[in-house]
């Protein structure tokens, strides 16, 4: 019995108990206490028994962690049938310093237990699991001990004010009246959650740590917009009405639900946002005048930890910077070659030539009222084509479908060009590729296949949906760990794979792929430039503009993202380079025995792993294939 089967067995057993409880209550009433005792004994056996294996221990830790996060329980989807018991769809997590301290204590104990499993008693997969869990837990411990207040929880890209709204509109299910009522209960918690966030900001303030001024500017504007919405046009209301209109409920019931939500938005949402807005306004003059984390207490050490966590390597900031410079030169040379093949005169920097191409009417959509629908239609067609084109290069394909949607209007001004959301564990929610269509001129047609390869097929959707669906992996390996070095490295590799196997339709499409790769190589330079070499935001923007040809808007959004999310952007290119390096090693050592499908299977079938683990897996596969 695999661990996933074991967990499903436990959940199935719990469901049987639930059904038994309902029948017992119906016929026996007071016998509920007896049934409750049965449930208690069942859960004690599952969660209190001695960990007889590292898989068992990490599964228990993960399940306890999941049930401690109502948002994650909703995201997974598998607990919705048990919502009468967990009531997770009625709740939001409320952060506190006490909870953070408790989590830290748990991590110390966790690390001690994991290290206590002797390698000689573990099988190959368990040794991999141990490496991952130790690496991840050590990073969490250091983050808490030294840098717990170094982040910017209210920022323009993934601020808590945006995340709360997006979670409710995109993840909370509304399939019946109870779930609609749960939605309202959750929205009512906004004020409590934001008040807890305000306490955190005030603790950070005591350390004289503030986000840069431009972050204050963006967040103040976003909060004012969220507060100013009329009830009927509030994103929380729009998606709510859209979903309940599809339910078989009477009009009076729908009207009452909508009225109740309107009252909650006025009494609990807007005041919560206002409290954060007041903090931003009152502390505006204290905003950090610098942009890099070098300016924070022990900032260099903090950045080193961020690089190690995100790249899963021991590269120093200077090494990452130099790799970036080398890659920018290499990619630029290939782009110049293509421009020459297309008949252009290469008489100016590649960035300027790409900027001219970005403004060429041949590659732009008309700015019509239905422009978003047209672009989404074309993206969906590209996804279908990609799904057919990749079939010769993989053994497995996701069961979950992928949909393309526009980035919500309330976040599109500052959101990235595209991003992906994984499907739910129970298969009821598809994978979603979000495309930012705020400025239609920022969607040149020659770059659309690149984004399709990256976010959908064979990029994020292939990897992350397959990971969730892979029942050969333990629960921890499916859900307990993730690193952008692997996920984003794979997505960037997927772009290049698209060129290599002929999924691009012309040289302009290849230029789109190269522009994307140039963009990721730039990240190595500008991220380390900002946080290690003390570059200003403006210097980083100038560098990226000259070398990529991206628009002013795109460059600004990206650079501002790296400032509030230090180190993460370096993981894409570092991950891609490692995957390509390992593929080349396998080709050289296996010769005619090399099969691209086998290589892809090794990279994808073991779940999301650090790059040092991926290298071990490829090396073992090479030796096994030789024999």
Residue spans for each PLM region:
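Short, Lys/Arg-rich N-terminal segment immediately upstream of the first membrane anchor
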Residues: 14-25, 439
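N-terminal maturation segment of proteins
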Residues: 25-627
